A protein has these predicted regions:
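Juxtamembrane helix-loop junctions of ABC transporter transmembrane domains
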Residues: 8, 12-16, 39-43, 47-60, ...
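Hydrophobic alpha-helical transmembrane segments of ABC transporter permease domains
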Residues: 39, 47-51, 91, 103, ...
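Membrane-integrated ABC transporters
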Residues: 1-48, 63-80, 95-99, 103, ...
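Transmembrane helix-loop-helix hairpins at lipid-water interfaces of multipass membrane proteins
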Residues: 34-91, 171-176, 285-300
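An intracellular "coupling" helix at the cytosolic face of ABC transporter transmembrane type-1 domains
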Residues: 24, 31-32, 123-124, 140-149, ...
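Helix-loop junctions and hydrophobic alpha-helical segments within the transmembrane domains
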Residues: 114, 118, 227, 337, ...
């Protein structure tokens, strides 16, 4: 198995401030919610910082080791303390609820933006990007980011406010002792920077392997039948084990670094508390003895409060370290999500075209010119890889209402021609004209809304048979839906279903046979009533009898419409106005069925070969 989109994992291990500023911008979209969280966290942090001050007051007033204790004001003290606890509890409940609400809002905003982006990307993106990769971005990465952003904001606000008040109180109590205690912060910053960079490196590798695992699961599920028929279970299991083992190793390394980081913070916090106890204790003894140290006068209440601040100060530092560690860990996810959001479609309309014709989300149908269906390739060059050109100086004219069939070996360029007509890709040089106008001067939606494309491998969407038939025309009435099904002889099998047109097809149409899915796909296109039909080996999944019925039915449908047919069974294109034999991206034979048979070339040989095969199969029956 091969995996795409992995270049993004190989980036420098450093925090990207612009990236996180952009992500945290999703939280700022709901400013009212953010302000509520801000106010709640400010109140909680202030109350947390007030507790050591109350402790200092209680010791110096009610205990007083240097004088006679007093109980004056103790009930007021209890009342104030209780009031602070109640207010803090209320605000804590509020910010927890609001943070959960923000998490959901961020998740919704990112997923909505990502889904809309996927609707606008060209086929080249999907050719290069696995479904497993996209699912991992849309589900696990977005969930990880929304959770981290929402709760990181909450934690960051509390840590910031609390540390600010702690620093202020410590410098207010004794600025010299405060400087001694805070001396451990610079080495903590250096250690944090080093470990965080290492964490990001291993987390990036782990997420890369996680994406591979998701792709492997997706391929394993989608290709289960092929795996079993080729007896690939053991080999697939070994390949999967290799991927999971690589992820396990990278995850363990990242976990070890994270586990090492927090004890370091705790140890440095203990050093700070010890410094407060040693120097502050000496100051208290000197004060009680009637002398002073270089720290000045320090009361017992001040020392206890200082120790409380010193020990609790490293809790927010530890939490901040955790936030930055999580950000380092999640940065790989953030990069991938934003990379998806920033992906530009290779095929896109100009701003001037969008202004006139609109976009897929805001079409301006009143400005759309009617399409007759005349198609011209004017000296077109095209390649997927520059080193492997597929079309060179390719010229072709398809008249409006003409049925043109494309025949050739696999890889000859038939599907490429179709993809260019549909503007799934654009020429590297040259022009493609629709009704005499370069189709790049008009919108993709203008063209594709007049296209009916039936693929060799049909895709149905979750829902009922009726929903799928009118997928391209949701406002179609019941009579139109049934008429479209009858035209392609799909109504026979539909009526045999227990729920008829209300039958659920399952994800991808899994509850129907390939032939049944193809019939529904035909009905869907006919109901959409396009001016240009594209049939890409569309009858290869249907039995011969049904195929003949469909051919007779769609002959009437295709009347006065342009149709391009990519055919494997040559018997299905005998009535085409023109048949083009494509080889190595060039037209080597051209004419109707009878003309090409008389020519005695590639088409003649291929047709006779298929005729003999069909005759043999009929004889075997």
């Amino acid at each position: 198995m091969s995996f795409d989109n992995e270049a993004e994992f190989d980036r420098e291990e450093k925090m990207d401030a612009k990236l996180w500023k952009r992500l945290f911008g999703y939280a700022m979209r709901n400013r009212a919610l953010f302000v509520r969280i801000l106010v709640s966290m400010l109140i909680v942090a202030i109350i947390d910082a007030l507790y050591p001050i109350l402790t200092r007051f209680a010791i110096d007033r009610f205990v007083r080791p240097d004088a006679e204790p007093t109980a004056d004001g103790i009930w007021l003290f209890f009342a104030v303390y209780a009031a602070l606890v109640i207010v803090q509890g209320f605000c804590t409940t509020r910010f927890i609820g609001r943070s959960g609400e923000m998490e959901m809002a961020i998740s919704y905003a990112i997923r909505q933006e990502a889904y809309l982006k996927l609707q606008t990307l060209s086929f080249s993106f999907y050719d290069k990007t696995s479904a497993g990769y996209l699912m991992a971005r849309m589900v696990s990465d977005v969930a990880r980011l929304s959770d981290m952003i929402a709760w990181s904001i909450t934690d960051f606000l509390w840590c910031g406010f609390y540390m600010l008040f702690c620093f202020g109180a410590m410098f207010w109590f004794n600025w010299k002792l405060a400087l001694i205690v805070l001396a451990v912060i610079p080495p903590l910053a250096v250690v944090s920077l080093y470990i965080q960079r290492r964490i990001l490196r291993y987390q990036r590798v782990a997420r890369k392997h996680n994406s591979r695992i998701t792709s492997a699961f997706n391929e394993g599920i989608m290709g289960a039948m092929t795996t079993k028929t080729l007896v690939r279970e053991e080999q697939n299991a070994k390949e999967f084990e290799t991927v999971t083992e690589d992820m396990r190793k990278a995850s363990i390394k990242a976990s070890v670094l994270s586990a090492t980081f927090f004890p370091l913070v705790i140890s440095l916090g203990a050093v700070g508390t010890s410094l407060a106890l040693i120097f502050g204790g000496a100051g208290v003894q000197a004060t009680l003895g009637g002398t002073e140290t270089f720290l000045g006068v320090i009361t017992a209440g001040t020392l206890v409060s200082f120790i409380n601040y010193a020990s609790s100060l490293f809790d927010p530092i530890q939490q901040l370290a955790g936030i930055f560690a999580d950000m380092q860990s999640a940065q790989a996810s953030a990069e991938r999500v934003l990379s998806l959001l920033d992906t530009e479609s290779e095929v896109r309309d100009t701003p001037e075209t969008e202004a006139k014709y609109g976009t897929s989300m805001d079409p301006k149908r009143e400005n759309w010119e009617p399409i007759a269906g005349d198609i011209t390739f004017d000296h077109v060059d095209f390649y997927y890889k520059e080193s492997e050109p597929l079309l060179r100086d390719f010229n072709l004219h398809i008249r409006a209402g003409e049925t043109v069939a494309l025949v050739g070996e696999t890889g000859a360029g038939k599907s490429t021609i179709v993809n260019l007509i549909c503007r799934f890709y654009e020429p590297r040089s040259g022009r493609i004209l629709i009704d005499g106008t370069d189709y790049r001067e008009r919108s993709q939606l203008w063209l594709q809304s007049s296209l009916g494309y039936v693929l060799q491998s049909p895709h149905l969407f979750s829902g009922t048979i009726r929903d799928n038939i009118r997928f391209g025309r949701p406002d179609a009435d019941e009579e139109s839906v049934r008429h479209a099904a009858q035209m392609v002889h799909a109504d026979t099998f539909i009526e045999r279903q227990q729920k008829g047109y209300d039958t659920e097809v399952g994800e991808g149409g899994v509850r129907l046979s390939t032939g049944q899915k193809q019939l529904i796909s035909f009905a869907r296109v006919i109901l959409a009533n396009p001016q240009i039909f594209v049939l890409d080996e569309a009858t290869s999944s249907i039995d011969t009898e049904t195929e003949q019925l469909i051919q007779s039915a769609i002959t009437e449908v295709l009347k006065d419409r342009t149709s391009i047919v990519v055919a494997h069974r040559l018997s299905t294109i005998r009535n085409a106005d023109r048949i083009l034999v494509i080889r190595n991206g060039a037209i080597v034979e051209e004419g109707d069925h009878e003309t090409l048979l008389k020519l005695g070339g590639y088409y003649h040989d291929l047709y006779m070969h298929q005729y003999e095969e069909d005759a043999m199969q009929e004889a075997l029956k």
